[in-house]
Structures are given as structure tokens and as C-alpha cells.
């Protein structure tokens, strides 16, 4: 189907298939040894030229509880906290149970207790520009209050070794809206393919093809405009080709018990490190990071 409406929502349309093909072409160089930038670019341009999708004005609207009308979504996996409840064989979405600590139950007045299994790597958190609003909108950080204003717990930006980590250490994913009174499942539909990905794939294709590199930086700046619009420095959204081609902002390495890097590991420059970082900041907690890490080496 080529239509984008209620009848095709949650189904893989022609545009979803093209986005999937673009993903495969994007990583073809590391999968097969033969880059397929032109093939990826063709699929991206088909989606862009369809005129059926656009960037959502507000980043948070992509991930809110009632997000089925998101103009950015190309393919979403529909979830429902009521109709899918108790059906372990059906599609269920309970990301908050994995990411939140047990103390978060009081923060959101939840009807169940989260498992508290995952937290953000401080090195990744520290790579964000402080004015990038995606840092605020993606991660629960600092003091956490109950609906009536009582301080429940604090999520510090630290994650020392497994032997020294407390249950509330590290920022937690707050990207997907959690309603007060949440159960073990959420009704947020998961945006498996979204228009921003298509734009970033196009930007990445243009760089190695050595054509229209200014166009590539313009596309990335367009995406970043949404992330910096509400900040004190919206001009930071604008980047150039040199920024995209520069090294990553992430300080990789292992952490000691005090949360300090004690082994820097591989310190080689990441080619297109700025673009690599942009993939991470835009799509954190959207189940695609490993694919990008493979592509960037």
C-alpha cells in the first residue's frame, strides 16, 4: 500500500519497505564490503519526494502516550495497555519497567513496581551539548518528585563499577511518556521507522559520495533545529560538513569504582564522528544504536 491513513497505520506500507531497504543499503559496506550509498539515497529520496511525512514540531510528541497521529511516523508498532494486558503472545510495551528504579513507582504513582535494570552510560550523557533539549526529553535525571511534590529519589549522572553501583545511579530513559497511574504496560506506539531517520540516512549518503556536502550539513542542522529551538542558544543547531566529519564527542573506555575512565581502550578517531553522535542523540533508546556502531567501526 502507498496510502498513509488509519487503515494502513501499524502496517508495513511501501514507504516502510523503502525505509527498511535504505537501512540495509546504509550498512552494506560493512555487511558485504561494497558500499551502496546511491541505492540508499534513491530509497530515501522516494520517501522524501512522496510528501507524505514531515518532522514533528515537538520532539516529545513523537513518544507521547497517544502518538498514533504523529506526522513523522513511517511505521509504528501499535501498543495498548488495556487490550494487550496479560497477553504474553501479543505485542506488549513495558520499557518503563526495565528502565525505572523501584522508587519510581511513587514518582508516577504506578500500579506496579519497575525492575530497575538499565541506566545511561555517563560517557554518552556527557557527550550531549547542555543546550540540546534531547538530553532533557530523553533522560530522567536529578531529583525525582511524586505528583504531590515530595522528593522520592535522585538519579545522578554516575555509573561506577557493578560492585559500587546503587539502585538509583545513572540517568533513566524517560523518552516514552509515562502517565501518572501507569501499569506494567504502556499505550505508546513504538516508532520503528520515522522520517528523521530517512533525512539522516540521506545526509550520511551525501558525505562519502562527495556531492552536495553543504546539503548534508543543512539536513542535519534542520533536524537539530528542533532540539535547540527552546534553548538559550538556538544557533547551536547549525553545523557544517567539518563538524560532521570530526571525531566523536564520546569519551570511550572502562570506568573504575569511582566512575572515572581507567582504560581508554581504542582511541582512534571515529570517521564522521559528528554524524555518528547525532544518530545517538536523536535515536537514543530506539533500538538502533548497535547497527550504527557497527557501521562506524
Where would I find each of the regions flagged by the language model?
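Acidic/polar-rich alpha-helix caps and helix-coil junctions
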Residues: 1-89, 130-297
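Short, cationic low-complexity segments
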Residues: 93-116
